[in-house]
Amino acid sequence: MLGPVILAASRSDRMRRLISAAPVSKQVVDRFIPGETVDEIVPIIRDLSDRGLELTMDVVGEDITRPEQAAAARDAYLALIDRLKELELGDRAEMSVKLSMFGQALDGGHELALANVRPVVEAAAAIGTTVTLDAEDHTTLDSMFAIHEELRKDFPQTGCVIQAYLFRTEADARRLAAAGSRVRLVKGAYKEPAEVAYQHKHEIDKAYVRILRILMEGTGYPMIGSHDPRLISIAQELARRAGRKLDEYEFQMLYGIRSDEHLRLAAEGHRMRVYTAYGTDWYGYFMRRLAEKPANLRFFARSMLTRG
């Protein structure tokens, strides 16, 4: 399987240098990451919003090693929120944040990440939107869920992400499927050991459906993070069986993947949110997109050969 190999490469400094230096790489990356600055991303926000789509914005970046970098990540999100306020687009775009960017892995990282993310959550609430805490590898999740619980005391609309491939996630879903919660379900995009995670696609797909049923039958707000046509159809059927209205759940897909499906679901009246990343530190994000789906890797390889 290529997925684990690609995920290993996402942590390789040598591979980072090789791919980042290739002239064609940036052209291909633009499919998934349409800009590096707030100014470059504003036309994308306007265009998607005009098409009836909502967004979740991710300022890409990982491997924070100093508190100053964590503070810079916080400030980047605050600048984005200020711009959304100016554009009066706060109700169309939420934020997705990785707590690793806010210093979670540093000494005293739990408290540091909470201190850095809280101003972002406060600023988002002030313009009528919210923040979702992304899930990262399994060793970070207890801290993420604790921060999520703490933030929800003052900002109950704060969301979180759960990953279907982890054995623990069904229990997490039961705990989170409560009134007022916002939970995004994804398959998972980190290399996890067999002791904690399913390793085969058919196992992950079955777990995804089991967990999605828990969320749909609960009283929270499920967010379906998938491009899989079969899982999308199953989600619609589970929502129907649970008696959910179209505004009581939403679909989320990545920018640059199945864009026609984004528009189709929105045209049918579904809430459709496009996960849109931007920034200069794109390597780790990009490599996980390749690992998630063989078609992404084929696209990248074909583009490298054609444009190189």
Each model region followed by its residue ranges:
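Positively charged, amphipathic and often flexible ligand-engagement surfaces
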Residues: 1-308
